[in-house]
Amino acid sequence: VAKFNVGGPDFTDEELAGWLGNYRGDLTIINTASASGSYIREMAKPGRVVITATKNEGEISFTRFGRFFAEAVGGLIDADLDNDQQVSLLESFLFASNRVALFYKDDTRLATEHALIDDNGDTLGSRAEWFEGTTPTQTPSAEAKPDGDLAAQKVLVKNAFEKRLTPEQTKQRDELERQVVALRRSKSSLDEADYYAKLESLLLELARIYDAVGDS
C-alpha cells in the first residue's frame, strides 16, 4: 500500500481510488513520487490516463521523473515527437522516461525508477521502452491491448490550430483518429482494397473537420 503525504492524515492509494470510484468523467492521474507504481493497479480504468514514476511500491528511492515530465508537458520542443507543435501526455511520459534512463546511464548507476503509463484500463501499465516513437510495439501480455492511444490525444498546452477547434470538433476528431489507429492495427486481417477504402473514408472525414476549422 502506498500513502500520499498531505497536511493531516496521509491517505492511501486504495482510499483515493475509493473516493474516485463513482466518478464517470475523463480523468488523468500523474503521480511522480517514489513508490507510486501501485497507483496503476488501484486507479486505472477505461477513460483514465494514469502515469507513475515507478513500476511498483517497492521502488522507494528519490525519483527524477517528475522534473523531466514537467519540462515536457509545458511544451518543450525536444519532447514533441510527432512535430505537431504541442506535447501530449504520452510524449511527456516517453520524454521523461528516456531522460531518466539517460541520467542513470550517464551517472553509471543502477536505475531505481521505471515509469509506467496505463490508459486502456487494464491495470497492467506499459514502459517507455515498449514504444517506437509514439507507436506501441509491445504489451505486458499477448492478450493485452496497447497503451498510449488516449494519452496521445491529451495536451495541456495546445498549439494554435488546436485552440481553434470547438469541443465538438475535438471530440469528433479524436474519435476518428482512434478509428484510424484501430484500422491500421487490423490491416493484416483485411482485404487490401477494403482496408484502403475504409482508411480513405476516415481520412476524408478528418479533412472535412480541418477544412471547417481553416474556414472559421
Q: Residue ranges of each PLM-predicted region?
A:
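Active-site-proximal C-terminal subdomain of hydrolase catalytic domains
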Residues: 27-127
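Extracytoplasmic/secreted envelope proteins and their assembly/folding machinery
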Residues: 13-20, 36, 48, 62-70, ...
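Disordered regulatory segments flanking catalytic cores
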Residues: 109-216
